[in-house]
Structure formats: C-alpha cells, structure tokens
Amino acid sequence: MSTTYNCVHYDRDLMRSCIYGLAVGDALGVPYEFRERGTFECTGMVGDGTHKQYAGTWSDDTSMALCICSSIKRLAYIDVADIAGRFRRWLERGDFTCDGHAFDVGVTCRKAISMGVPAKSYDGCGNGSLMRTAPLAMLDPIEPYNIREVSAITHAHPVAEWSCVALCDILRTIRNVGTPAKGDLWHRYGYIASRPVEAVKSDGYCEHTLEAALWCFLNTFSYTDCVLAAVNLGDDTDTTAAVAGAIAGVYYGFGAIPPKWIDQLRGKAVIDQCI
C-alpha cells in the first residue's frame, strides 16, 4: 500500500452535504435491504426490518466513508495504510459506528480487511468500495490513481476501481459546475436515465449500483425523491441509496435534506467528528 503525501484540502460544508446525503440514504435503506422490488414502499425513516436496527441507524457504507474522512481530516493527505487501519478498527472494534459494533459487513470487505489481501477476481466487482468513495471527490487535488488505491484496499478488480473513479467524476462535475451539471450528466448518461425501471438493476455489483444511483438522480428533482426512489428499487437498498444520496446531497445541498430525517439520524456526533 502506498501513501500520497501531497497535501489535500476540502470545503467542510460541501463534505458535510456529501456525507450526510450518503448517511441519510444509507439509514433509509437499512430496514429494507434484500427486499424484492415492489413488495414494500419506503416513505421515510423507520426501524426494525432486515437488520433489526433502530430508525436512523446507518451501516457499513457510512462507516467506511467516515474512515476515509477521518484519515484525511487528521493527516491532510491520502495515506492508504492509515485508511486500511481505520477499516480494521471499524470491523474489529466498532469504531465509526452508531452503537459500537459493525453490522451488515460485506464478505469481500471482511475478508480483505481481516487478511490484508484485496479481491482481484470477479468477486471483487461488488459495490463495497464504491459505497465509500464519495468523500474522495470532495478533495483537492485528487487523481484517479488515488481513488483506485483506496478502492484496492478491499476491491482491486479494475471494474470496481474504475467505477469508483466514475462516481468521483460525476460528483466533481456537480461540485464544479453546479446546477447546470444535471444537464451535462443527462447528455453523458442519458442512455442510463432513459431506461425503464424494469431494466434498472439494484444488486450488489458495482456498475449496477452506480447506474441505479445515477438513474435515480437524473429522474428526480429533489434529494427526498432521489433517495426514496433508490430505496424502492429494492435489493441492495442501503448502498444504492447511499450512493444516490451522496450525489443528491452534493447537488441539492445539506439544506435540501429533510430536517426530520437529520433529526432521526443516529450517530451524528460520530459523523461530525470525522468531517
């Protein structure tokens, strides 16, 4: 694992929009994970469900993103070994969580963190690195190889790495262009946005997750509608909504996230310490 000692910086308000957008989407999706599309309707923050958690509890998507954020905040540069160490603290000690324990940990992430060996096979094409990569898009400077190295801590397959790069490119387009970015993204990704919902896959494959999140963003007009659409796609509900929530959070801003959902979100002190 390498270390990039180039100093990086970020706008804290923008990072907050990104992380809270991600965390709220994650928490909305947690109760419905693995549920089949059309068998439920998410309209707000609820508890219990798949993982028997309190309403507002976020999962591995947010925890791993916070590991990245906290490392950058402390060091002001990208240290892959330090980030990997924080992943281990999350998995083994329950750091960066709401309740002091990790849950809903993906098989690939667990194995890579425990053994220190990232997945390079097709099994490494899951969305376990994509779900946490959004904070990197808020950094200046940031290069594709930085994003790929952070992905490769657990997911070293090129498809997984370049899916992370693509998400960061989308987020940086929004960050740098502002409101007109949606038109630009429609021009680039209209072939995804124009698909009927039946053709949108929301499983754990990294490319499918990115496409589903982008589909939700491009076919809605508010943060609320974007993340609810993502959850209601079913299957990997928390990760799809986390990625869609990060995109919508950066585009619409922190103020567009319903205050009730912010109030219901658990672990806000943990989040704020990391950003």
PLM region spans:
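Structured, active/binding-site neighborhoods that engage oxygen-rich ligands
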Residues: 1-275
